[in-house]
Amino acid sequence: MAITAAQVKELRDRTGAGMMDCKNALTETNGDMELAIDNMRKSGAAKAAKKAGNIAADGTILIKNGEGFAALLEVNCQTDFVAKDSNFLAFANAVLDAAAASKVTLEDLKAQFEDARVALVTKIGENINIRRVEYIDGANLSSYRHGERIGVVVAGEADEETLKHIAMHVAASKPEYVNPEDVPAEIVAREQALQIEMSMNEGKSAEIAEKMVLGRMKKFTGEISLTGQAYIMEPKKTVGEILKEKGAKVTNFIRLEVGEGIEKKEEDFAAEVAAQIAASKKA
């Protein structure tokens, strides 16, 4: 099976590993993305974290409430300078207003604002992209924006201050699910199988490995779920414990961050200047 550039890029985005590592991993698994990720974790090829400069595109996250829902929008540009430009922000807010008016789909937003986008690109000189729009329903919603780059909306049954603090926690801690039991069964099963294999590779018997994995799995589902995480304002307690104390409940949340999954090209300014000088000498 031929491995495509798109597959390699997806694996790079998800693991932070090098291009050749990703291509080799996909070749070995005949294009099976999930198996490639598991194999890379075992071999240590996947990096623990990706450099922010390799994934962070610029732009803004905007939030606006509609009737019984909230809209979250990401609009991208190429530089942080343009992200603060009044023309760019006016365009982004116009798109947001349309989205919040009637839950317009991303495709319809792109079509509706294509002429305005093209005009803005011509005026500013950078590529502009309406990247994402998400909607969250709820009679009781609280939002939080961390600068221009992170936006969170939380839906739940709690007082305004509690929901606001939970939204701030979501912004900082990046949970993927509300509760540990919300983690899909296939994700749990895959992680459990991987942990058992890794434990046995450490020389543990199958019986001991399974017991060790029980604790690891509780930690795994807790770390990626909101109520299982340590609360940033009281780290000795989980978010779930804080909510229980307050008689509160979170039913859903959405968190968007500018540039998630986008690899931003590293610019070598010195090399660029040298190339320009060399070109001018040839002219």
Curated annotation (Swiss-Prot):
Pfam families: EF_TS. Keywords: Cytoplasm, Elongation factor, Protein biosynthesis. One of its GO terms (molecular function) is translation elongation factor activity. GO terms for cellular component: cytoplasm. Residues 79-82 are annotated as: Involved in Mg(2+) ion dislocation from EF-Tu. InterPro entries: EF-Ts_dimer_sf (IPR036402), Transl_elong_EFTs/EF1B (IPR001816), Transl_elong_EFTs/EF1B_dimer (IPR014039), Transl_elong_Ts_CS (IPR018101), UBA-like_sf (IPR009060). SUPFAM superfamilies: Elongation factor Ts (EF-Ts), dimerisation domain, UBA-like. CDD domains: UBA_EF-Ts. It is found in: Cytoplasm. Belongs to the EF-Ts family. HAMAP family: EF_Ts (MF_00050). Associates with the EF-Tu.GDP complex and induces the exchange of GDP to GTP. It remains bound to the aminoacyl-tRNA.EF-Tu.GTP complex up to the GTP hydrolysis stage on the ribosome. This is Elongation factor Ts. It comes from Shewanella baltica (strain OS155 / ATCC BAA-1091). The lineage of its organism: Bacteria, Pseudomonadati, Pseudomonadota, Gammaproteobacteria, Alteromonadales.
